[in-house]
Amino acid sequence: MGLTSKLEKLKLKELTGHEAAVKSNVVNGADTDDTDDIDEMDNEGQSILMGIIAQLRPGMDLSRITLPTFILEKKSMLERITNFFQIPDMLLKANRTSDDVERFVSVLAWYLASWHIAPKAVKKPLNPVLGETFNCYWENISDDCSAYYISEQVSHHPPKSSYFYLVPEAKIKVDGILIPKSRFLGNSSAAMMEGWAHLTLGEHENEVYEMNQPNVYCRGILFGKMKMELGDHMYVKCRKTGLEADIDFKTKGFISGTYDAIEGVIKNSKTSEVLYQITGKWNEVMEIKDLKTGKKRVLVDTKSSVPVKPRVRPLEEQGQYESRKLWKPTIDALARRDHTVATEEKFAVEDEQRNLAKKRIDDGVEFHPKFFRPVNEKEVELQDLEYVIYKKFDLKSNPEVLTDEVLSIAPILPGQKHDEKFEIPAFKKHEET
């Protein structure tokens, strides 16, 4: 059976026992109100997935392969990125810390604290379409602060998601880009999470922390139980202080080892002195050991922090290519576990994108993002970001000015009036400033 036939069969797939499960509101111990927590990989589903993957070669790029909808999360990757910002109290604590080393440790703790925020089942976020945007905000997160987030899919092949985060009252901003590259590895698939984020603390002389991400592995896609693992090295470094963290996300060996373990160190790159050792599990408790004193303490307890979810404008105020509006029919079908409709709705979005891409080629029109501009060759320290928000932010400005500036870029708050400037390509708006 060919790849197309396998995908067509998905339209006929209906989950057995679904009605009974909905009545009890529980499937495999998870609340059906959140279908992202439900493992829907039954025997037929695994057979379909195996039929698709059996036609692939190890190392093959999966970005152009249409995967069955029962492994999809009910959100776009642009929204999934906001998981990093859902433990804001830890970031604000780091910002309040005056000691350079302790501040670095606190920044690392904040960054490690968010990796456990994910569906209980193995789910993959929806691939954003070119020009898709997701904007959101947080009110009164801590210390009387608010936060704003703007994101845009700046490239589709390869997929590149640019994002910007700002806490005006605390003079904190984050510029980042995520470039996931999927690979087939036999009984596993891998999402190589390329891209970097730059966290800037304006209250500490614009101190910048550069950080990347661990890679994501999905095990057991051909046989065995599907399991998501984080693997490989994650780095956090601050050039101003010379402090660096190297965190190794351990993957379980075939015979020995354990799931979800991390090991790492914090060192001073200027002196090569190793200051701390990090151990634990990224989805449970992580500890830090001072190598001078031998004292060990909890760095992060993931159960002690409750994620603060972002807020978005009402659906009726959103534009056609804002994530939640664009994917609403697909997401609604996924929530009902109606994979026939979910597949059809997802295909409709993707088919429209193919038509738009063809029209751009026919018309000789090049796509340009409207919120993010390309980094130019003179911006040496920003090269790994590739794209940045088009407006320059002076973190010395007062919070009111910073808030006005971020709201002038994109519609974020409920009731915010649409401005025609929002639609102008970012590089043109940057040239005018």
Curated annotation (Swiss-Prot):
The keyword Transport applies. It comes from the Eukaryota. One of its GO terms (molecular function) is sterol binding. Coiled coil: none annotated. The keyword Transport applies. One of its GO terms (cellular component) is cortical endoplasmic reticulum. The C.albicans mating-type-like (MTL) locus contains, in addition to the genes for the regulatory proteins (MTLA1, MTLA2, MTLALPHA1 and MTLALPHA2), a and alpha idiomorphs of a phosphatidylinositol kinase (PIKA and PIKALPHA), a poly(A) polymerase (PAPA and PAPALPHA) and an oxysterol binding protein-like protein (OBPA and OBPALPHA). One of its GO terms (biological process) is single-species biofilm formation on inanimate substrate. This is Oxysterol-binding protein-like protein OBPa. Belongs to the OSBP family. Keywords: Lipid transport, Lipid-binding, Transport.
